[in-house]
Each structure stands twice: as structure tokens, then as C-alpha cells.
Amino acid sequence: MGDIIYIPKGKAREYSPYSLNIYNGCDHNCKYCYVKTMPYYKKVSNEEIKPKKNILEKLEKQLKKQEINEQVLLCFVGDPYCKTDTEYKLTRDILKILLRYDIPTAILSKGGERILRDLDLFKKFNKIKIGATLTLLDEEESLYYEPGAVLPRERIKVLGILHDEGIKTWVSFEPVIKPLTTYQLLELSYPFIDQYKVGKMNHYQLPYQIDWRDFGNTITKRLIELKKDFYIKKDLYKYMSLKLDDNYIDQDYLTLRKPRVKIIPEETKVLQPTLF
């Protein structure tokens, strides 16, 4: 059996040097979820989400023999504050172990107010950041694309509460379903968000085209204007005519460096055709 804390591969590596998945499956059932493209997904029932077997014991065993000083993300597969966690409360137990070993921790969740259950633990960490994926604002659209997730405005509200409590906050703008909505989400959230990670749509076929070059350039310029820490994922960056220095970000640490930006002429950058 593999370690509970593992090194993510491929595109996931842009989010964190380490990750930890608590449950098998996810009850959010998001239409765009990349996990649905994996063979693993076919073996998991979203109707019966179960904890990984003996996860607490295995985590303790791993941390006794392996020193981990870099960020661990909860979670890439599934949500640490899914509805199932209200029964098992395993995320809280996992956090207690990570806290004891002083491991830098990041959380990404669409669990809304369920996250606040562990606010007392968050405050004890030396390095922790709590984030949410924000894709839409309209409730009907959210229920269509993310039928099991907490509605976006509740996620935004909780991030504001966490910020007021002194917790570092972040947002994942990935996937991007409607660029105009993503711009709105940025304007709503930036007063209480410390950092953003921005991607595109990769695994779900939208019924319309998106100008990824325009979106990437526009949101990056606005993030710079707002003096926000951010990371533009490689899948989006390759479309952009806005050139960022290679070393403007340290993706393995909780504090992103300030971007240094310069514009390069359109004709000097070969843009990929849109995928849709």
C-alpha cells in the first residue's frame, strides 16, 4: 500500500508538493471533476463515501519514519469537509496529527460552514491556509454543475469569517466556466483573500468557446492591480501574451512572491488554438 501523504503528479503538482486524500469518493458529484476521467473513479460509488481504511494509523506510521517539511494539501480526490465527514469527523483527526508534527497544511473545500467546526485547530497551526473553489455565483448554475457542493455565496462568506479570525485564505479559480463570473468572484472576494490560483477548463466540454488569452491576460492584470499573490496554471499561461518571470512564484510554500510582470509583443508569442 502507498503512503497516505503522497507526491502528486502532473498538473496536480502545481497546487502542492504533497497531498493527502481522506475519503474514497466525493459526494459533490461536480460535472467537471477531473477525477471522473480516471480509471479509479469507476471503482468508487458516490452514493457511499467511505474513509480510507486505517488512515489514521497509517498516517501516524508514515510520519514517524518520514519527515515532511513542505505543504500537504487536503485533498485532491474528494473534499475534506464533504457531507460524509459530518459523520466520521476524520478531517479533524487528521488535522490533529498534522498539527502535532507541525506540518504546513493547505485545505481546499466546497464544504462551506462545515469548515468552521475546526477553526480552533486552524488557529494552532504555524502554517495553514484554507481555500475554496469558486466557479459560479448563480445558484441554479451551481446546482447544475456542483449538485452536492455548498452554494458559492456560503463558501465566500466562510472565507471572510476565516480571514477575520486571522487565518490565511485562498481561492482556486479552476475550472473557469464563465470568465465574467470569475471576474465578479474576484471583485467580491479580494478584500479577504490572500492568494489566488487560476486555471481554465480542461476536462469538461462547454457548449461555447472561451477566449483563454483574453481571460488570462485580463485576470492577471487585475490581480497585479490588487497587489494579490497569485499563481497562473501552466495550461492557462500558455495562451497568454502577458509575460511573467519564471521565478515570480514559489509554488511549494504558503506565501507567494509578488509577481514581476512585463508585456511582450503579441507576435513574439505563439498562442495555442482554443480547445472548444
Which residue stretches match the model-derived regions?
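N-terminal [4Fe-4S]-dependent radical SAM core
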Residues: 1-71
